[in-house]
């Protein structure tokens, strides 16, 4: 205690008069609390922070102690009043010849049960009105509890229904998952086969494209077509063809007139040979014109 007093004095000198009052209150409170249990105040470091905390704790403890003292005194006063009232009631009953000793045992038992029920219902007396009020309060509480129970039961049923549906859904999903796992191996094999076929088809497609381009080029070279031939060259070729048709038309008309002559093999042969030479010359001229047009386009 001497160390504690020294520490308190040091803190008191450092903080001034207001802290000194707090330190005195803290010292008195600590001493009373530890002496109540037969122990001494332990040594610890007293600082401004610890003094403030202990002061707040002491203030709260004293306030609660005062409140508890007031409540205890009130209970003692009520108990003494109840005892006095019980003594008066006992005197009245004894004067009327209705003391507890003179009453039948069943009456005493009933009175005891009535008192126990009153205590259980937490009512001040055993008047009928008090019992009715208490029973009404219990009925209201019972109704509230039943409503809460019905609501909880409804929510429980809904949750149970959701749980059943979730379990069914989970079972279905597990079944689907197992089926998919069983189908993985054959599907992987089929996918590998499709992949191989796709690669082969891609190679074939490339080959067919190359062959198509090759055949297309060969065909174009055979007919003498080049990408440089424009619409103008084609129109010129068509005009040359019309000119050749005009040139060959008299020959064809002459040949047709020979069809009406009597058959003369020698003359017919000579005429045919002559017309063949003319037709060959016209065809050669057409080829030269076409070739000249192609060469001009290439240049």
Swiss-Prot record:
Coiled-coil residue windows: 76-96, 164-184
Protein name (Swiss-Prot/TrEMBL): AUGMIN subunit 1
Biological process annotations from GO: cell division; spindle assembly
Gene: AUG1
Function recorded in the entry: Involved in microtubules reorganization during spindle and phragmoplast development.
KO phenotype (gene knockout): Lethal when homozygous.
Organism per entry: Arabidopsis thaliana (Mouse-ear cress)
Major location (coarse): cytoplasm
Compartment annotation: Cytoplasm, Cytoskeleton, Spindle; Cytoplasm, Cytoskeleton, Phragmoplast
Cellular component GO terms held in the UniProt record: HAUS complex; microtubule; phragmoplast; spindle
Oligomer and partners: Part of the augmin complex composed of 8 subunits. The complex acts on microtubules and interacts with gamma-tubulin in spindles and the phragmoplast. Interacts with AUG3.
Keywords per UniProt: Acetylation, Cell cycle, Cell division, Coiled coil, Cytoplasm, Cytoskeleton, Microtubule, Mitosis
Residues where N-acetylserine is found: 2
Family according to the record: Belongs to the HAUS1 family.
